[in-house]
């Protein structure tokens, strides 16, 4: 074990397993038991090519996104991102003085469901600079992202985060950030029933 590898043993975010996974040596099996297996042999990409693939996929699935969003997600510099963007057929749009990048025309994507229960650390919350997220009103930022790095499970209603939820042995607890009208409550109950047919939803 090298001096660079030694700190991984005691790292609280995955330890040796994370080091081996990020190094391409271990991966999760597709089985239900969540066992780790050796990764199959593969030929790694050139670092620059790999970055372009990652950025292309990000723009495809998260776009339109701003440079701030991409810097937040990848932890790459603005200069690095601009170089990578220049090699991709990314499209742009202007809104409120900001430039947004994307690969797929937004109008060609399927409509967002009215009500979605998002898991903790959901990619929808992590894919955008949290202070500029199109889904998270700034007033609710600290209710979703706490000071210890936790990202709570949330309710996405009509395209905006509208509350937090948690599950216990008896039911699903929903804490709305604002009062829900009867139509909204009905939509939330319907979505919850589809996910948890054997558990009631309690709106606190």
Predicted regions and their residues:
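Long, low-complexity intrinsically disordered regions
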Residues: 1-125, 129-131, 137-204
């Amino acid at each position: 074990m090298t001096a660079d590898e030694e700190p991984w043993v005691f790292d609280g975010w995955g330890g040796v397993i994370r080091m081996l996974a990020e190094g391409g040596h271990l991966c999760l099996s597709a089985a239900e038991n969540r066992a780790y297996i050796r990764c199959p042999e593969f030929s790694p990409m050139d670092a620059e090519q790999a970055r372009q693939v990652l950025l292309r996929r990000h723009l495809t699935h998260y776009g339109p996104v701003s440079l701030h969003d991409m810097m937040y997600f990848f932890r790459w510099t603005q200069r690095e991102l601009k170089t990578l963007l220049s090699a991709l057929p990314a499209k742009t749009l202007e809104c409120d003085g900001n430039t947004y990048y994307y690969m797929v025309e937004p109008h060609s994507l399927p409509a967002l469901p009215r009500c979605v229960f998002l898991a903790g650390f959901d990619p929808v919350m992590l894919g955008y600079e949290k202070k500029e997220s199109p889904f998270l009103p700034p007033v609710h930022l600290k209710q979703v992202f706490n000071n210890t790095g936790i990202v709570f499970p949330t309710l996405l209603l009509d395209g905006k985060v509208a509350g937090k939820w948690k599950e216990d042995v008896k039911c699903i607890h929903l804490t709305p950030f604002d009062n829900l009208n009867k139509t909204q409550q009905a939509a939330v109950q319907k979505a919850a029933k589809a996910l948890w047919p054997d558990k009631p939803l309690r709106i606190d």
